[in-house]
């Protein structure tokens, strides 16, 4: 998170009562910690205490009467004020979006003039990278599934948080497994939101910063997220590197690969199910050092109807936060038998 001058919108006359803000709480990703504290310091801390983590929050300005908000955190002994946070650029999705949508229409857009190329924005649990915004058509262009996240489907109405540079980070260190409660107390020129009126956001720490990035640009038989396959399962992917991806242009999930983070392994799990979703067989493979894997149809169980593929990275016992997971059908299950003989009789 870079140092920026706080943005305060023009205050218009109206109700100056502090209102509850729509907000998002998150365990701070590695890239944000690097920008906040420097990579050497962060890496040293994680080397000594790999399970430590930090928490943050971003909030949407309720109206122009609101100046900023205070982040309050409860680690079990009651709420303490931890830091201030500036309200972030925000919007809502006008329509549902799928895995592939990199341009989509927004509504309820506020303060998008603050966003710059490569700024991180978040929709639900997916981090995207800002590319551009057409203010006339309200169309946002992004890169999908950045850093330790993967592309997800999002429903219309989902909130878009442009929290890069506009969030509050608690500088206390927490450990994996700790359960925290966070609140954003908004401030106007004459009022502060009561603690009891602010929405509680619960968060469980999971060692996010130390975990390797997942594989990206995963294809099954040369397709992204296919609904079915008809023959051998051919999986391809590219690698990501948490330590390397700390500057320059942000890589989206569909971009090319980089050298994998040192000491990181790539594991593949293929599970076969019959028509009743009963597990028939599970095959696991260490595919480190490669970028493709073929599972022959002849090696599949005769009654296989659906297949689940999980592709993940592991380093020093820590799995990636968001592995690639996809389930699809084996269409040959529905094929007509090829070895039937017929007898024709005259009537």
Q: Could you tell me what each predicted segment is?
A:
Residues 1-347:
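Interface-prone segments of viral and bacterial extracellular assemblies
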